[in-house]
């Protein structure tokens, strides 16, 4: 009997973990264009509001700034340089009380080119 109780407690804890995983997802969005990123976040929020799920965010994550320095002249002037910069904007959305309808609508959501979308379960 103790073995059965141990097995049942293990399975119930595993089921609880699975259920917890399915009730919350995290969506991470990245883009070089902050306006395009904000438009995508608004569309995702509209989908989540329609289906009745709860959400947190958008949580702005740190912007990654990359600077590239290039010599302007192909031959002599090493002192003459030009700098280019690329900023990667990031947002995090947490959706709680996830419903099947929400998942289906998010699957059909068309992501604009220039926005990277990752979903973490």
UniProtKB/Swiss-Prot annotation:
InterPro entries: Ribosomal_uS10, Ribosomal_uS10_CS, Ribosomal_uS10_dom, Ribosomal_uS10_dom_sf. GO terms for cellular component: ribonucleoprotein complex; ribosome. The keyword Ribonucleoprotein applies. GO terms for biological process: translation. SUPFAM superfamilies: Ribosomal protein S10. GO terms for molecular function: structural constituent of ribosome; tRNA binding. Keywords: Ribonucleoprotein, Ribosomal protein. Residues 1-20 are annotated as: Disordered. It holds the Pfam family Ribosomal_S10. Disulfide bonds: none annotated. The keyword Ribonucleoprotein applies. Belongs to the universal ribosomal protein uS10 family. Part of the 30S ribosomal subunit. Involved in the binding of tRNA to the ribosomes. This is Small ribosomal subunit protein uS10. It comes from Mycoplasmoides gallisepticum (strain R(low / passage 15 / clone 2)). The lineage of its organism: Bacteria, Bacillati, Mycoplasmatota, Mycoplasmoidales, Mycoplasmoidaceae.
């Amino acid at each position: 009997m103790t073995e059965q109780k141990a097995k049942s407690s293990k399975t119930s804890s595993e089921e609880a973990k699975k259920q917890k995983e399915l009730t919350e997802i995290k969506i991470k969005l990245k883009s070089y264009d902050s306006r395009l990123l904000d438009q995508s976040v608004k569309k995702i929020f509209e989908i989540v509001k329609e289906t009745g799920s709860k959400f947190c965010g958008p949580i702005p994550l740190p912007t990654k700034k990359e600077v590239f320095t290039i010599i302007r002249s192909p031959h002599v002037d090493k002192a003459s340089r030009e700098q280019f910069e690329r900023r990667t904007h990031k947002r995090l959305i947490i959706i709680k009380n996830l419903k099947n309808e929400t998942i289906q609508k998010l699957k059909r959501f068309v992501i604009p080119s220039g926005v990277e979308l990752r979903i973490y379960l």
